[in-house]
Each structure stands twice: as structure tokens, then as C-alpha cells.
Amino acid sequence: VCQEAEKNGYELDQDSQDQIDSITSNLSLYASVYGYSKPVDYLKAMYGKGATLEGYQNYLRANLTASGYQDSYKDSLTFSADEVSAKDREDSKVYNSYSYNQYYLSSSRYLDDEATNEEKAAAAEADAKTITGTDIQSVADFDAAIAKLEVNADSSAASTALTDNRYTSVSSIIADWISDSSRKEGDKTYIASTSTSTDEDGNEVTTISGYYAVYYTGSTDNQFPLVNVRHILAGFEGGTTDDSGNTTYSDEEKAAAKQTAEDLLNEWKQGEATEDSFAALATEKTTDTGSKDNGGLYENVYPGQMVSAFNNWCFDSSRKPGDTGIVETNYGYHVMYFVGQSEETYREYLIKTDLETDAYNTWYNTLVESVDMTVGDTSHIRTDLVLSANS
């Protein structure tokens, strides 16, 4: 990829060059920390005796060049409406999302060790029938039936709710049933989870390991627009970090961040109170480095991309351009400004993402296959070493 980049005149941007300079300048520090007098000695210890400072810089440059060129290739890809439609027609359910509750009844939990696999599976199936019977008319009924099972007498049990779960994330065991076009809210079923093996006589044996009980609540074709939003983050400051690296903030620290967010929103309201003035304030005051340079803007935001509170505010059905608000996340308090809906739908985004992946993989594999294998300098490689394992 690096060779292709150089052939096409691709050059590293200043940020990448600054990254190389920063890493190189820190080598002396790393060498000192690990007990080496010179950076090159540290490099030799890390990468082998043939390592040099120039070689390391060339490696960094090649790595960043390849990475940057790959990104630029992806950014250059565009797809027509016909291409998007054709991809959609290949298997339209792939771009749907499904909502359902499921509960797994493992055969191993039934009967005692003396029982056969078939007997255990039969007991699990009997319970699966019970919790998906005609008297089960709601998720509440489903969970109540699960809780009443004798196998759950000594524990609390309930189904797992999966909301707007992409088809590609649905278990293959239940995917065909879930995605059936005739499926409607309130449908329920149970499906066996099986494995196949070969017995000592060479015969194929199918074993039931349990049953998935499923209660269907709905689906969406994801034909709704993405959104564009600006925000100003008043990040939490201070905090206490534990041995696992988790940081918690006191009520006082959270209150301080909330007050900052409220002050920022009031400052905006007392000014021009336009999108441009919000963007200017974001550039000046936000603690989110990822959006600071573009006025706090996030474009084409899709469901689940942002943390829950941020996401819920953006996709509130009542949201309209110019709306503002404050939401709390684990990062701090966000002053929100709703720019509006994107021209692209979530479904189109999903399809284009797949098209991009297909195009990139084809491009990358073609590049790799066209490269002639060459052997570099191997003089520093020890060939007289024999590794053995103690038995």
C-alpha cells in the first residue's frame, strides 16, 4: 500500500509528520526508563540488532503513509443510487433491525446425571412449550412464565430484550424465523440449538443442547434519516481513578460541570443564538477535541453511534432544527444544538458501508497480489538457534 501511495504522489499530512517527530523525540525518554543509554540501544532491544534510528523512522513513515492512503481511498469512494438499490436487492433483510425477547433453556440444567441427553432435551423442550404457549400474550407474560419454571426455582430469571438488533447480529439459530416477512408482534416460538458429531461407527449424530424461546415485538427497515448535531462538552474535571483505571466523579465535580454547561447555554441564548454562534462557542469552549475544530459538529449520526443519553436526545421524534438542551453522559454535560436531519437514511448508510467494505477489500487484495516478494537484509537474523519445549 505504501508503494502504491508513493507511486500516486500521496504525501503525509502535517499531523502525521508531527506524530513521527513526537514518537522519535520520545525515544530518549523510553530508553532512559528501560535502562538504555541511547535511543538506538532501546530500538535494538525492542526490534533486533539490525534496528537503527533511520530504519525506525522509515518504518513509522511507511506505516502512516499506508494508513493515510487507505483512508484517502475509502474517502474517495462514492456509490450511485442504482448501486445502492442493487446491493439492497441482494438480500434486503440484511439491512433490517429486529426487536424481540429471547430465553435459552439449556438441556444440561434438566434432570440428573443419570438422564440421557435425549431425556434432558425433552425436559427442556417441555418448558420451552410452556413459556411460548397460547396463554403468553405479552413480554410480561413471557417473563412471568420463565420465572415460574421449576428449573428456575432457586434463582431469578427473565428473558433478554434485544431492541432494534441488526439482522447480522441475530443468532443464526433464530434468524430465519425472526426475519420471516409474515412475522408480527406477539409471535412466539422455540427453536432447538443443535450440534453435529460422528460416532465411533462413522454415523452422523445430532445432539440438542437446548432451546431458544423467542417472543417477537417488532422490526424496522431503517428507512429513517440520519441526523446532524452540534454540541459543547463541559467535561468532568478531577475525579478519582481506581487500580483498574476507572474514574469516578463526586457530586460536587458533576455539579460544577453541569453549571458550566448551563452557563454556556445561557451565554449562547444571550448572544445571536444562531447555529453559527453556537459553532463559534463550541470551538472556543468545548472540551471534546474530536469536534472542537469544526464547531462541535457531528454529521450523519446513526442510532447507537453515540452514548445512550446523547443518542436519545438526537433521535427524539419531537426533535426539530434549532432545538437546544443539556444531557449528561459519562464524559460530562453536553450542550446540544440540533442542526437537522440528513439527506441520507440509516438504511442507505448501512448499504454504503457494505459497498465500501467490498470495494476496499477488492482494491487491497488486488494490490497485495500484485506485489513481488523480495527478500531483504537477513544478515542480523540468527539462524543457529534451536527452540525446544520441555516435556
Model-derived features with residue positions:
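Sec/Tat-exported extracytoplasmic proteins
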Residues: 3-9, 24-31, 60, 64, ...
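Short, charged helix-to-loop "capping" segments that act as catalytic/coupling loops
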Residues: 13-17, 271-277, 317-319
